[in-house]
Structure formats: structure tokens, C-alpha cells
């Protein structure tokens, strides 16, 4: 319950989204560079942008809080509970504060990395559903699979929407699976790449325990046998099974996709190249 509020020095922002955020502020909010932040200089669409790409509300609140208040000279990351517990008017700053999207991004990154994987799963499912990669209701097996994908992607996931870049190839229907044209032309289409992929397919056929450890060992032996560098095959393999050159580790991708899907996609890549 709000017991006390103070107006900031400049006029209220006209946009309703910003009005609710800034009505209780004290200092003048400025944009990067010169001049006050106002409805005329700050695009209101950006509010929806932060929501739709998957910024954490806690990260945004943490950043906005420190634009007009500070706990001390060194503490930046605060939970909502800590903000409530430590807040006093005596530490409200009087100088104008500048809204810096890059600074907000750093808060988002840190909050994201600290977030429990179960909460990430719950928050990312709606993004996958919006992209029509997951149905409603969500099948029971999706939770554990998505947990493994998130763990494999690690700190590559900066916002909730990033899950679309790192997991679409896990959930897409095989008839809709497609390759990034530039990645395919560079990594799979060259004759030498196609030949190595064809040979490694036969290695995968013989892998009985299709998990990260055995797959890594199989690839290492293949590299030694062929007298090649890991980069000569791993990028080709990644594009063949995921359709793109970025994503979680290639061994995680293979294990999560499963043997049947991997062989099917490699066959498609060989037929397409």
C-alpha cells in the first residue's frame, strides 16, 4: 500500500503507460544526450517492446528504481523485497537521471542469469505458444525437455524471447523444418562438407547411447580417423540437424533431438546439398 508519493519536477508524461511508471518519481527523467524525457522525445511503443521481447519486470523495476534512488555507492542488483525494505526518502537523488537502454540491458542480463530454471520454463512457454511451436495445453514432456534446452543454451538466453532462436528446431514439425539458406550454402553445400557429413551419418547410426558423452566421444574418434579439425565437421553437423549456425552445444542438440530425427534431417541435408 502506497503511503507517500512525490511528484517529479517536470510535467506529467502524457502516455498512460509512462504516467503510471513515473508519477511517483522525484527527479527529472532525461533521455540519452540532452533534454528531458517526454512523450514527444521517447517512443511509447518501446514499453510494449520490452514486454514482448521478454524483459523481466524485476529487472526493469530494479533499473528504474535506481534512476532516482540508491542504497549505497556500490549495490545495483536488488530484489523487490529488498527495495521495499531499504527504501527511504532520504536516499532519493535530486539530480536528473538519464534513461540508458544499454544499462537496462545489463540489469536484464544479470537478473536473467540469476532466475531459477523452473521460472524460465514457465515464462518461456507462452513465447513458444505464440510462435505456434507449442500447443495449449502444454504436453507433460515439454517441461523436462525445455529445461534441458535452457540449461544447454546457458547465458545465451538474455531475454525470454531468445528461446525462439535456440529451440524452434526442437519443436517444429518435420514437414516445416527448413534451413537458413546462407548457413546451408556455407556449411553444408560444399562437396567436402557434404562428404564428411555423409561419413559421420554412418558413425551416428552405430551410436547406441544417444547422449552427450557418447556422442562427443564418437565425434572425437571421427575427427582423429579423418585427420580433420573439429570445425570441419561440427558446423556442418549443426546446420544439418538444426537448420542454423547458432544454438546450444552441438552434442546437446543431437541428444535432445534424438537419433531418429537427427538421421532424418541429415538425410534431408544430403539430398538438398
Please give the residue ranges for each predicted region.
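Charged substrate- and nucleic-acid-binding regions of tRNA-handling and nucleotidyl-transfer enzymes
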Residues: 212-272
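Short, mixed-charge aromatic SLiMs
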Residues: 83-92, 131, 153, 177, ...
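Alpha-helix N-cap and coil->helix boundary residues
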Residues: 75-78, 99, 119, 214, ...
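Amphipathic alpha-helical interaction elements
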Residues: 52, 109-113, 158, 205-208, ...
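Near-N-terminal "mature-domain entry" segment
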Residues: 107, 115-118
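Alpha-helical recognition segments enriched in aromatics with Gly/Pro capping
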Residues: 1-107, 111, 125-127, 235, ...
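Small-residue-rich helix-loop
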Residues: 117-226
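Short, surface-exposed helix-loop/turn micro-motifs enriched in polar/charged residues
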Residues: 72-75, 96, 138, 211, ...
Amino acid at each position: 500500500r502506497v503511503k507517500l508519493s512525490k511528484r517529479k519536477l517536470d510535467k506529467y508524461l502524457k502516455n498512460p503507460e509512462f504516467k503510471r511508471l513515473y508519477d511517483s518519481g522525484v527527479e527529472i527523467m532525461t533521455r540519452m544526450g540532452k533534454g528531458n524525457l517526454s512523450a514527444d522525445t521517447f517512443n511509447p511503443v518501446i514499453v510494449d517492446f520490452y514486454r514482448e521481447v521478454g524483459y523481466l519486470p524485476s529487472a526493469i523495476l530494479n533499473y528504474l528504481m535506481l534512476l532516482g534512488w540508491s542504497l549505497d555507492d556500490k549495490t545495483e542488483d536488488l530484489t523487490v523485497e529488498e527495495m521495499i525494505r531499504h527504501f527511504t526518502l532520504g536516499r532519493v537523488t535530486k539530480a536528473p537521471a538519464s534513461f540508458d537502454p544499454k544499462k537496462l540491458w545489463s540489469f536484464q542480463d544479470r537478473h536473467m542469469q540469476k532466475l531459477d530454471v523452473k521460472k524460465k520454463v514457465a515464462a518461456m512457454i507462452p513465447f513458444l505458444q505464440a510462435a505456434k511451436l507449442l500447443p495449449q495445453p502444454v504436453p507433460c514432456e515439454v517441461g523436462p525437455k525445455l529445461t534441458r534446452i535452457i540449461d544447454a543454451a546457458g547465458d545465451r538466453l538474455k531475454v525470454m524471447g531468445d528461446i525462439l532462436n535456440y529451440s524452434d528446431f526442437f519443436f517444429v514439425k518435420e514437414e516445416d523444418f527448413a534451413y537458413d539458406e546462407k548457413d546451408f550454402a556455407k556449411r553444408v553445400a560444399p562437396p567436402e562438407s557434404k562428404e564428411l557429413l555423409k561419413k559421420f551419418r554412418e558413425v551416428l547410426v552405430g551410436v547406441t547411447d544417444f547422449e552427450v558423452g557418447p556422442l562427443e566421444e564418437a565425434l572425437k574418434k571421427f575427427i582423429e580417423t579423418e585427420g580433420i579439425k573439429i570445425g570441419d565437421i561440427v558446423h556442418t553437423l549443426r546446420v544439418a540437424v538444426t537448420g542454423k549456425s547458432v544454438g546450444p552445444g552441438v552434442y546437446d542438440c543431437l541428444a535432445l533431438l534424438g537419433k531418429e530425427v537427427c538421421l532424418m534431417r541429415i538425410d534431408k541435408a544430403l539430398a538438398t546439398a
